[in-house]
Amino acid sequence: MNQDLSMNANQLVAFLQKPTSEFTKADIISFIQQKDIRMVNFMYPAGDGRLKTLNFVINNQAYLEAILTCGERVDGSSLFSFIEAGSSDLYVIPRFCTAFVDPFAEIPTLSMLCSFFNKDGEPLESAPEHTLYKASKTFTEVTGMEFQAMGELEYYVIAPDTGMFQATDQRGYHESGPYAKFNEFRTQCMSYIAQTGGQIKYGHSEVGNFTLDGYIYEQNEIEFLPVPVSQAADQLMIAKWVIRNLGYRYGYNVTFAPKITAGKAGSGLHVHMRIMKDGKNQMLKDGVLSETARKAIAGMMVLAPSITAFGNTNPTSYFRLVPHQEAPTNVCWGDRNRSVLVRVPLGWAAKTDMCTLANPLEAESHFDTSQKQTVEMRSPDGSADLYQLLA
């Protein structure tokens, strides 16, 4: 058994003993047959930023092979505003590397994200997912490097206020229960997201915490690990779908809205980025920010208008981007500064083995911490067109 995969929460990874990037059609069919999966879902992001779903009952193996190979027709004009009804048919073709067992389905169901294709069987050039794919591919072809990203997904949970163990207003950062009321909900979300293939770094309660008209509003965050940029967008789409579905199950209202009310913390979707080559992080050189990293930051300064257009699509986005709320208000960058457009966070650049200092019985590990350095784009929020933003 591959020890790197033995603890993976995705059932297909555990069963097939291979990473998702190596999934084949034969793997999908084998898993469906041996795990008695009865339904297949095709899922795809539409212009409104939400995942759409097409359900299939598995009649026999021939039918299963047909839908996995040929996909299905959909009405593009009902999915995207830029497609006219007069010529709107599109194909959706599943991407096997995105397969996961639906954690909410009562009937055993395998779900996959899909790509859009036009009438000629070519990728739909205007599809946001394909735009990101092209940008990522071009970046690698031009630079010989890989662009990776990870998101910090912030959201509010809203439920009736019990009046017990009141948290301090706007002091909810990393709060524990019973002052933080929705830790169990967040950890269940994290478990389900991991089962769908999401690579999670951690979760915690966030700054925003207040009561209004008999309801408690508690802000939470789930942060991911850096992965290839297209995968980063996919897992954020699925994560939002998981959080909304679980909120519905619990009877909670969940919102990714950038701003709920003035004077309270808004919710962002900060994006961390790093550039990789031959498995090595290119963001540091000799313990300081590399020329490659500085060029990337300069590019983000130049592209700030486009980043804002795709990252802040709701009018309430701009009520969040105000001073004294840990939100950027100027096109600039800085070390450890949460008020800039691009922050350079702590990156374990010091040559100190903190683990041995905290745990005297441990020998020095010589752990390679250079992989950890990222730069963080802080302006986007939950209204973002994820694929266009990351492109």
Give the location of each predicted region.
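ATP/Mg2+-dependent ligation/transfer catalytic cores
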Residues: M1-F210, V227-W241, Y252, G382, ...
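Alpha-helix capping and helix-loop boundary segments enriched in small/acidic/polar residues
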Residues: S176-A180, N209-L212, V227-D234, A257-K264, ...
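Structured core elements
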Residues: M43, T53-N55, L113, Y156, ...
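Short glycine/proline-enriched loop/turn "hinge" motifs that connect secondary-structure elements
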Residues: V101-T109, E146-Q148, L212-I216, K264, ...
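Short acidic (Asp/Glu) and glycine-rich catalytic loops that position anionic groups and cofactors
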Residues: M7-Q11, A167-D169, H270-N281, F367-Q373
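Histidine-centered divalent-metal-coordination microenvironment in nucleic-acid enzymes
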Residues: L113, E152-Q166, N209-E223, A257-G279
